[in-house]
């Protein structure tokens, strides 16, 4: 049975960015984990996966092979941590803005 995980990445559609779902499993040797999905996205929807996403997934694939761990699980760990950091940064920004608004109302 295939082992894969679902992820969403911001992709470029003619200058506009939109989230798109991808499924990461263990690719065949010599293939990028998102190679076929990237081709489909380009051919069928006119979209591209950002280079930094492709590079990060490739690096995670190399690391997974080196350490004999499933790529989907490593991606959940690595990308989940990155998304949590991003969410907490946005929450901190919102807290700062709320505090500034509260202080402005008191003046």
From Swiss-Prot:
Location of region: Disordered: 86-107
Chain intervals with Acidic residues compositional bias: 92-107
Record's protein name: Uncharacterized protein RP240
């Amino acid at each position: 049975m295939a082992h894969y995980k679902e992820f969403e990445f911001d992709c470029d559609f003619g200058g506009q960015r939109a989230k798109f779902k991808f499924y990461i499993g263990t690719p065949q040797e010599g293939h990028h984990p998102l190679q076929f999905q990237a081709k489909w996205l380009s051919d069928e929807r006119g979209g591209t996966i950002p280079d930094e996403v492709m590079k990060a997934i490739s690096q995670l694939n190399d690391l997974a092979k080196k350490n004999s761990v499933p790529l989907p699980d490593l991606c959940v760990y690595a990308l989940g941590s990155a998304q949590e950091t991003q969410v907490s940064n946005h929450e901190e920004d919102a807290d700062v803005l709320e505090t500034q608004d509260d202080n402005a109302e008191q003046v």
